[in-house]
Amino acid sequence: VVAAESDTDMRAFYEGQIAEGHDGVGERYGEALADLGHGGATDAVAVLYDLHQRHQGSPMIAAALGQAQMSAGATDAALATFTDALRLSPRNVPLTIRYAEALMRVGRAREAHVMLLDLFNNVAPTPEQIRLTALAASAAGDTGDAYFYMSEYHIANGNLPLSVQQLELALAAPNLTEVQRQRFQARMDEVREAISRDRKRKPEPGGEQKASR
């Protein structure tokens, strides 16, 4: 959600825009993100709260407000903002991600894990979102699932050998259910088969020269 450049202070730009009368939603939102990106969480909350009151159907503004409230130390207000916004925009990806991050920060990783699973059973995750799910599972003590998600992260990044390593760790995790064990093993078999197919497609070094002799 926070799109302000971390290396560039955009506050002066937005202050100038607003001073010139360009004070629409975009300018005010940009001003808040610039404040948040440079340590002005309290100022960002004030601006975003006003925008949120006027545009309660915007998950983008709600997500930014919740994040700003977390940064300002207003944890209860942030969690309430996220909860209310998700009722209006269930499974909104940026909003759910920010809410999950907030839950992890306050020690509610298991809720974050469940929330992310629900989201990504309906929306295909990016590699970084898979990694976040792994972090949530690990923080919740769901070790086997955490390794499994990291295997999926490596698959998404094209590193199948690392995926196999993570699946081996997943299968060695304690307290697995039979369903988990079967799921992890099935995925392991799929990945190993993919590695085997890939190796067969690649010619051996010097293979072409040998064939031409």
Region annotations inferred by a language model:
Residues 138-143, 155-162, 176:
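Short amphipathic alpha-helical interaction segments
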